[in-house]
Regions:
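Acidic side chains
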Residues: 51, 82-90, 249
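Interfacial/capping segments of alpha-helical transmembrane domains
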Residues: 71-85
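Extracytosolic (periplasmic/ER-lumenal) interhelical loops and adjacent juxtamembrane/interface segments
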Residues: 84-96, 177-182
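Interfacial helix-start motif at the membrane-water boundary
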Residues: 91-113
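Transmembrane helix recognition focused on a "late"/terminal membrane span
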Residues: 115-118, 269
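Conserved, well-structured interaction surfaces
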Residues: 122-129
Length: 301
């Protein structure tokens, strides 16, 4: 008997609504004096009309792309490779219950990490704890641009590529192996959306604390960066353990998350050097070699 699944709320719609809800909290707060210890440095580009237009356009594009590419029940890419097969054999959980809990845990981590820069860094720390609504708003706009860009690229890539999730290999006629069996979600493997959004938020948190002393000027910032980085890494591994993504999907998602979470705010707002008010000296140094290109992040915290 074929099970009828309830329609899923598109994650792009949820992200756009969450951003709108968080933004309303900034406007709902009464005006108050700025805290003395948290200021937006003159050399950092401030959010302006172009950023607001860009963020609105990105939000609309996320909704549009989500509707245009809902996924296909017949994946267009079913190819495999030794790297993906080896990682799957090593990490995939054999028990359906264990895979289910791995998936639920990764969902919780993904949601928490996706909201973290906007809810914790921008609202709770900058606006409430440090009493600096100006810095909080600047951080929130950067968060919106970064998260919505990552979401848009993720959903568009999933819809255009149409790669089969690894779990499709195990789906029998009844689809008991996984709830995604037979659904449109089974063709949204590349790239890993949980990973791209989680790594995006972790990278953005690390960049924010490197420039703005949200966690103080001691070990708080590096510890927060390490914590969200480990959490994002955990989400990445759990997606393979739950048989939701191939390892190459996870690697691509992590690369996108790093680009949108770190390079995006550096290029558009902070610049690639520590300002006068920076909580640390932060540098991104390109390293080129034969067949490789790396960006080395270095700094003193």
């Amino acid at each position: 008997m074929t099970r009828r699944r309830a329609p899923r709320t598109p994650p792009q719609a949820a992200l756009a609504l969450a951003l709108a809800a968080l933004a309303s909290l900034f406007f709902a707060r009464p005006a108050r004096a700025e805290g003395p210890g948290l200021t937006w440095q003159p050399e950092w580009r401030r959010a302006g009309p172009a950023d607001y237009i860009l963020t609105s356009a990105l939000g609309a594009a996320n909704l549009g792309v989500g509707l245009a590419f809902p996924g296909e029940r017949e994946p267009s890419w079913t190819g495999r490779n030794d790297f993906d097969d080896g990682a799957r054999d090593a990490l995939r959980l054999r028990s359906r219950g264990a895979r289910r809990w791995a998936g639920i845990t990764s969902d919780i981590g993904w949601i928490g990490l996706t909201l973290y820069p906007g809810l914790v860094d921008s609202l709770l720390l900058a606006t409430v704890a440090h009493k600096s609504s100006d810095v909080g708003w600047q951080l929130f706009v950067i968060y919106g641009e970064s998260a919505l860009t990552a979401g848009l690229v993720t959903v568009a890539t999933q819809g255009l590529v149409g790669r089969a999730r690894p779990l499709v290999q195990e789906c029998g006629p009844g689809g008991e192996y996984d709830p995604h069996c037979g659904s449109r979600q089974q063709s949204r493997s590349f790239l890993a959306g949980h990973v791209s959004m989680s790594v995006n938020s972790a990278a953005l948190t690390c960049v924010n604390q490197a420039f703005v002393p949200l966690y103080g000027r001691g070990a708080g910032g590096p510890l927060a960066c390490a914590a969200v980085g480990l959490a994002a890494g955990g989400v990445s591994v759990l997606r393979i353990m739950a048989d939701k993504h191939w390892a190459s999907d996870v690697a691509a998602g992590a690369a996108l998350g790093l680009a949108t979470g770190a390079l995006y705010p550096l290029a558009l707002h902070y610049g690639f050097g520590g300002g006068r008010g920076a909580a640390s000296a932060f540098r991104l140094t390109p390293i080129a070699g034969q067949g490789t290109f790396l960006a080395l992040a270095s700094g003193s915290f």
